[in-house]
């Protein structure tokens, strides 16, 4: 009898232990692992979310920048962290759709290894050109590339990145004579563009918009859609490149798989409330990102479908990211 009573007490304690973390959460700072370097577009967006979500959660965040591998280093570290709600990451199309579609050896499963907190928003990227390149839009660029014996080279922030896929789509759909050059970061692309070492490079809107508006470079096209940051610049879809209704420009929040649902729900509620704030919407618009919350369960299903679509594009465009 005493053993039965003890077992019941232990079971009760266990149940209380599962219920208590959500009520007390967060009891310590939450580690926010970022896929990009300090000062980048993703870093700026993450710090904005942390600033606004912290008070809603009655807690705070500790930022940890872990750039590299197209974002896979930070995302993999999050997937392998304890599923207790104290490690999250800001990823999206590159880390959870395009890398899984092009890298068979990716160390994480983009769907199964994460608890999806929710979509943060959608964003485009921009193809920048040096001012001395004799092309001002995608039509002129394609004519220039195809008239050159060697074609043209363009940079992106890594094999399998959004920039790589956007460039590959142009090459595939428009039979463009172009060659991809993988860089380690957007910052390096900016430096080499301004230094005259390369003529073309894809960057995020946060990084690219000031460069265009200051006249230091010009914008050739955005991908996948027009951006509110540069509304006068055509998107690749404006130029007749169909994406089949699939996403390739989203940001999302993720925790490790197995994170208790009450904690995920608490994070999701804070995220949703943050994205409803007018000042957050306005600041995100300045960053070239449109706030657009989608619940984690729905976002996960969308991601799984998008991966399959982009796998075929990767195969057709011969994108392999080992």
Per-segment meaning from a language model:
Residues 1-27, 139, 322:
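Short, low-complexity disordered leader/linker segments with a strong preference
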Residues 41-45, 49, 53, 74, ...:
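Stable alpha-helical elements in mature extracytoplasmic
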Residues 19-113, 151, 159, 174-200, ...:
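N-terminal (or domain-start) structured segment
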Residues 27-29, 172, 213, 238, ...:
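An extracytoplasmic/periplasmic, membrane-proximal ligand-sensing/linker region
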